[in-house]
Each structure stands twice: as structure tokens, then as C-alpha cells.
Amino acid sequence: MAGVSFSGHRLELLAAYEEVIREESAADWALYTYEDGSDDLKLAASGEGGLQELSGHFENQKVMYGFCSVKDSQAALPKYVLINWVGEDVPDARKCACASHVAKVAEFFQGVDVIVNASSVEDIDAGAIGQRLSNGLARLSSPVLHRLRLREDENAEPVGTTYQKTDAAVEMKRINREQFWEQAKKEEELRKEEERKKALDARLRFEQERMEQERQEQEERERRYREREQQIEEHRRKQQSLEAEEAKRRLKDQSIFGDQRDEEEESQMKKSESEVEEAAAIIAQRPDNPREFFRQQERVASASGGSCDAPSPFNHRPGRPYCPFIKASDSGPSSSSSSSSSPPRTPFPYITCHRTPNLSSSLPCSHLDSHRRMAPTPIPTRSPSDSSTASTPITEQIERALDEVTSSQPPPPPPPPPPAQEAQESAPRLDGEEVCKEAKVAAAPQVWAGCAEEPPRAQEPPLLQSSPTEDLMCTESPEQAVLAASPEPDASVTSVADAHAADTIETTTATTATTIADNVTPAAASLIDLWPGNGEEASTPQAEPRVPTPPSGAEASLAEVPLLNEAAQEPLPPVGEGCANLLNFDELPEPPATFCDPEEEAEGEPLAASQVLTMPSALEEVDQVLEQELEPEPHLLTNGETTQKEGTQQASEGYFSQSQEEEFAQSEEPCAKAPPPVFYNKPPEIDITCWDADPVPEEEEGFEGGD
């Protein structure tokens, strides 16, 4: 069964209801009814006349609902009455269907104080409705409801009660029980609160412990990290200290080694200086000149071998001084004396040190006296404390000596003379060969016999003035060879080529040229006296011998390197009767201690220093000699194994000219001034070596065997 519906006209229903309940509104009633054939409630009418006007609008054929506001005089507020109108002509089915709608309609219209059921106008009484509103029976004002109430009152029973007498024990138990549970509840709540607090405290304590543990772990890590850093720093400091100590030790070792090296170098320098000083002292103190012996042996060998066998002194090989008794590949067949002698052990055959043999015993005293008188100057003694000798190494001294020797150069040679002069030389050479062959036949005891027979000669003027560099082995210019060869008799012509390389070792070019003019005549006279067997030949005038012509581009000949501090000028070997008393080079006996008395040697020093010629006269003599030269491009045997020309040799001499000139500038003051030095760009080809031991030990054995 369907219920009443308010949805279709809900706004109209509520608007009419609001008009009734609002005090400001004039309307005080509203009538609602169903739509035709449906249960939808709608507004039928509204007005301001109260219950009387409302009762006039009810219809007998419809079910209607009236809502009215009734004002009571005793009440301040109005009352609201809901009238349920069921007309007499309404079907019963409709009445039964709408009976259940009253409660929903009263609920929809809130504030209904009294519900009045009416089917006619007489049921709508204003006095009855007001009475009911005043005593509270307004609900029962309906006759139907009144009858129903009366029927209920008749059937009602007496009302019972639940009251009981209060029992103190029971009441106390009940109260105690309630208090107990309340206390238990409170205790439980307190316990739970304590447990919560304990859990919170435990959690806080755990957090604190965890934080403390983390802090301790962090501190421990930091401590270990600091310890590790300290260890690393200590290790680094130790490593740095070790490195510093190692560096100091290395520096100390290096300094020690450096000091040792410096000490060794200093000791080596002192040793070399002491050797130089010792050698200089020995050279300065010796009264004889060992090189004289070898020069005389060369002359003897060249004289014994003949002029055809003697190699020209200008047919040389560079780097090696000329020596007739040294067999060379480019020289002619050697003589018997030179073939039997052994070559020198050093590349400098003329350089000797402390063991220089004293070979004066191989010659008679007469020859020794003639050598001493013909020597230009004695050996200049140089103090071992001389700074130029003691503090300078051997190589520098040799170089300076070479520079001093080559500081002066001769003028260029004139063109060679006509070949007519060659014929003049052939006869003296043949005579010299015969005389030297006779010298081989002479016995050894005759050497010492001549010493007693030959008286010393008084103050014969020396040929040449020596210079401080006479110990150096050098080769003179062609005019020096002529100076040594021109005063000799016919027998000396055979060795003029050899004398060109050997007789001029101790003198420079300028010194020889200046002393040549004044010494030719006295030297010739003294040589004539020395050769008694050839007096007739010496009395006759003799043409000047032929001198080899140097190359056109050369200005001076090669200088052979001699020892330092030797100053004796080599005289020509006598080839007269004394040649028979001379022994062969292989048959010479052991030489005596000295060549001659040092007193006699010292007597010739002032004469040698005083006899110095002027430059113009020396140059004129040199020009006359050079005009007679015929041989083309001679060569000299030098310290090497190959030949070199005089131009190259001259360049080698000029290479050392500057330093030698500076060192020996003061020593050249007593000598004649030389031409200015000539410098060359080509380095020297002379093999300069340090002082060596005795270069001819095998020849000494040969001398002993000859005895």
C-alpha cells in the first residue's frame, strides 16, 4: 500500500505552512488535499479567518487536512491544530487507505499540538478544541479517540513498582565493588601510563646510549686517525731526516772525494813540477852536452858512409828529426855504422831525461877541446826555482821554446846559382870519404892518447851566441848550414848536408844570421889549426859549398825539437888527421863523465856574449850564401815517419811563436833582434812528447861491446 507523497508539491506545502506559523503573516490556516486519483498531497486553499472560515471549505466527497493556528488567551504562544477531514461520501476503501496518512502528515507539519478528526461541520467546535488545548486533552477531542480511551481505562490494571528497601550491607558491597573497579581501572591506567613512560624512557635511554656509542666510536676513529697521521708524520720526518743525512753523507763523500781528487791533482802537479825542477836542475848542473856526442856520431857515420850514401838533411819526413843513423824508408842505403845502431825508443830521439849518457870518452881530448872552443856559448844554468821552468808543465815549456825558436824568420831565398858550383864540391867530398874511411881503421886506445897530446887552446872566440832556447831541437835556415860548413876543409864537405840539420839545433834563425859575419874568419883559422894533416888544403882558397835550396813558398826550415835548457852550439867534426882517431858509431867505448873541464868551458862565455854581429852584415852574408844554392826543395827527417816540406815545417814553427816569444823575451836581450814573428793558421805537425828515459840504451851496450 502506497503512502502519502509530498514530493510533487513540496514547495507549495512548505510555503503555506510557513505563512501559518509566522507571526508577522496574516494567514492563519491552510487546507491540503490529494490530487485526483493519487496520493500526492497538494495545497487546496489558505486564509485568515480561523477555524470558522476553515470549516466552510471542507467537502464531503474528499479526504482533506486543515492546518490552523489557534490563539489562547491564557497562553502567550499560539497553538496549532491539525484537522483530519473525512467526508461522509468518501468510500470506505479510501478512508482505510488514508487513515494511515494522518501520522505522516502531522510529522510533515511539525508543531501540531492537537489533531481533530471530523467528518461533519459539527465535529469542528471551537470551544471543545480550546478546552482540549487548555487541559491537555486536546488529542482526545475527537469522538472516535474518546471512545477508544474510555475502553482502555476500563481494562487497566493497578500499576506496580520496583522500589526496594535500602540494605546497608548490600549497598556497601555495591559501593565498595564500584570503588574497587574504579580503583582497579585507575591503577590500570596508571600502570599503562608508567609502562608508556618506561618505554619512552627506555627508548630515550637507548637513543642516548646509541648517540654516546656513536660519539665514542667517532672519537675512537678520530683518535686512530690522529695516531695514524702522527705515525705518518713521524715516518715522513724520519724519512726526511734520513734523506738529509744521506744527502749530507753523499755531499761529505763527494767533498772528501773532491778533496782527495784535489789533493791527488795537487800532488800530481807538485810531482810534475818537482820532476820538471829536478830535470831542469840536472840539465842546468851538467857540464857537458850529450847531444854533441850524437851529432859527432852522425858526422862520423855520414863521413864513413860517403857522400853518396848519406841522405840529404832536407829529405825529411814530418814529425821526426833528421838522424843519419836511423834507417828511413825514403832515404838511400845507410852506412855500416847507422845500420848497426838501433833506432831510438821514443818518438823524440834527442829528448833525454836523467839518464843521459856521458859520451865524452869516445873522443880524444883534442877533439873535445876543439868542440869546446868552437861552441858559441856554454850551457846556461837555470835555477830549479825558476817559475817558468818549475811551475810550467813539460808540454807548455816545449811549446814556448818552439814559439821562441820560430819567432824570427829568415828572408826568402834568392834563385839558385848556376850548376857550375857543383863541380867544386865533388873533390872535397871525395877527400872527405877517404879521410873518414881512415878513421874507421884507428884503434880505440888512440882516443885516450890524443887527450894527453892536445893542449888546451886559449880563448878562441865562439861561433854563435846562444839563446835561452838552445835546448830545443830546431832546424836552422840554409844560411846557418853555410855558416857551419864554410870554414871547413875539403873533408868536411861530405857532411855538409847532415850538418845542416844537426849543427843548428840550439840556435834561432836571427841569432845565427847576426853572428855569421864576424866569426867566419876566426872560425876558419881555428879549424885550419885543428886539421894539421890538411894544412895545405886549408891554405888554398876554397869555394863556398853548395847549399840546398828551400822551396819557394817557405821562409824558414823545420825546427827539430831539442831538450830544454841546452845552450851549446854544435861544432863541425874535425876531418883531418883527427878523423883517423875517431871510432865508428858501433865501435865507440863507454863515454867518460864529462866532455871537458867546466873551467875551460866557462872561459868562453864572455867571448861568446861579446861577439855579436849587426843585422845588416849578417843579412848580406846570408844573401851571398843563398845565391849558391842549387838543390831543389830539400827535406828534413823530423820526429814523424813521413816527409814534410819546409813550408809546412815553417807553419808549425809559427804556430808556437807567440807564447814562446812572451816567455823568452827577456832572455833574448843580449842577442841580436830577430825579424817579427810570423803566425800561421795550420797547427803544428811536430810530435811533441814529454821527457823520456835514455833513448839509446842499446847503443850504450854497443859501446861497451866495442871496448
Swiss-Prot record:
Q: Which UniProt keywords apply?
A: Acetylation, Actin-binding, Cell junction, Cell projection, Cytoplasm, Developmental protein, Differentiation, Neurogenesis, Phosphoprotein, Ubl conjugation
Where is this protein chiefly located?
cytoplasm
Compartments, record wording = Cytoplasm; Cell projection, Dendrite; Cytoplasm, Cell cortex; Cell junction
Q: What else is known?
A: Drebrins are classified into two forms of the embryonic type (E1 and E2) and one form of the adult type (A). The time course of their appearance are different from each other. Their structures are closely related. Adult rat brain expresses only drebrin A while drebrin E1 or E2 is observed in immature animals.
Annotated ADF-H domain ranges read: 3-134
Q: Which residues carry this modification: N-acetylalanine?
A: 2
* Segments of skewed composition (Polar residues): 355-364, 380-395, 639-652
Region: Disordered; residue ranges are 209-438, 452-497, 531-557, 582-609, 630-707
Q: Which organism is it from?
A: Rattus norvegicus
What is a single cellular component term in the Gene Ontology annotation?
dendrite
Q: What is the name of the protein in this document?
A: Drebrin
Instruction: Output compositional bias ranges, type Pro residues.
Output: 409-420
List-wise, which residues carry Phosphothreonine?
377, 381, 392, 549
Entry comment describing in which tissues the protein is expressed: Brain neurons.
